[in-house]
Amino acid sequence: MSKNHQKVVLVGDGQVGSAYAYALVQQGLAEELAIVNLSKEQAEGDALDLEDATVFTAPKQVYQADHHACADADLVVICAGAAQKPGETRLDLVGKNLEIMKQITKSIMATGFDGILLLATNPVDVLTYAVQKISGLPASRVISSGTSLDSARLRIALAKKLGVSPLDISANVMAEHGDSEFAAYSSATVGGKPLLQICEEQGISNDELLKIEDDVRHKAYEIINRKGFTAYGVATCLMRITRAILRDENAVLPVGAYIDGEYGIKDNYLGTPAVINASGISKVIEVPLNERESEAMTKSAEALKKIATDGMTKVGLVNYLIK
């Protein structure tokens, strides 16, 4: 990855993709941003609009492109796919989005792309697993937004409950980005002090913590029911991961990472803290879990693996499962 000229390709310029592109421009990340979208006119419009914004942020080439732009990209961010609708779970999107990911991944890899892939399309854990298998890229270079957004939501909820800044809370949501996720309360801290100790001192019950966990789990549905989609939160998570990659930060972030032995789980993608730098994921941070959390991690992994296996088989990707 060149330090002097970094190129990002965005695939999918919908609500999330366009919000991500705007965040990228606002942060002055990368010198080149290519936007690939089914509707070329929309991508051209966004590119022209974002180009104006660069005058006030940092010089950047922003333009509409096709998949050939991926050939020399440092990072390709995939936001394309069918969006979650009111009443749908993320896992309801498996079939149609696996088919879309199959075509997108093959098109990207046909260009000779050898950078890092970052995914946000749901169900993101299942799709990232499939994309890694199809691409043949090292698992360390195929990452998803994972539970980064869920962890942010947890920190916000806890901050409101405790009357502190979310910046001073260290707490992770883990496993699936979806209905089987859980809050790893046993390792959470507030200003360095164990969260559970603070809750005991303040009379905050376990039931209250489980209610917060459930609210975090369902926050996306609340947003979708009101405005039809989520975009700003996940786009900002993608920007944060992008910054860690392009600036080689060695930042510990909750992402969707390949798990192969950690937590007693093999060959899966799950939300967990990991060290992110210019090589992608340099290390998975295996968080100590209590019995409840460990069981939740295992159950989530088993459910996701079955969905991935069944889904990939149905769309003709069974041969990739043995790789």
Swiss-Prot record:
Subunit structure: Homotetramer.
Gene: ldh
Recorded GO CC terms: cytoplasm
Listed name of the protein: L-lactate dehydrogenase
A Pfam family hit: Ldh_1_C
InterPro entries in UniProt: L-lactate/malate_DH, L-lactate_DH, Lactate/malate_DH_C, Lactate/malate_DH_N, Lactate_DH/Glyco_Ohase_4_C, NAD(P)-bd_dom_sf
Function summary: Catalyzes the conversion of lactate to pyruvate.
Main location: cytoplasm
Residues carrying Phosphotyrosine: Y221
Catalytic activity: (S)-lactate + NAD(+) = pyruvate + NADH + H(+)
Locations listed in the record: Cytoplasm
HAMAP family found in the cross-reference section: Lactate_dehydrog (MF_00488)
Gene Ontology terms describing biological process: glycolytic process; lactate metabolic process
Family, as annotated: Belongs to the LDH/MDH superfamily. LDH family.
Keywords: Cytoplasm, NAD, Oxidoreductase, Phosphoprotein
Active site: H177 (proton acceptor)
GO MF terms, alphabetically ordered: L-lactate dehydrogenase activity
Domain of life, source organism: Bacteria
Binding site for substrate: Q84, R90, N122, P123, V124, D125, D150, S151, A152, R153, T230
Binding locations of NAD(+): V16, N37, G81, A82, A120, T121, N122, S145
E.C. number(s) listed in UniProt: 1.1.1.27
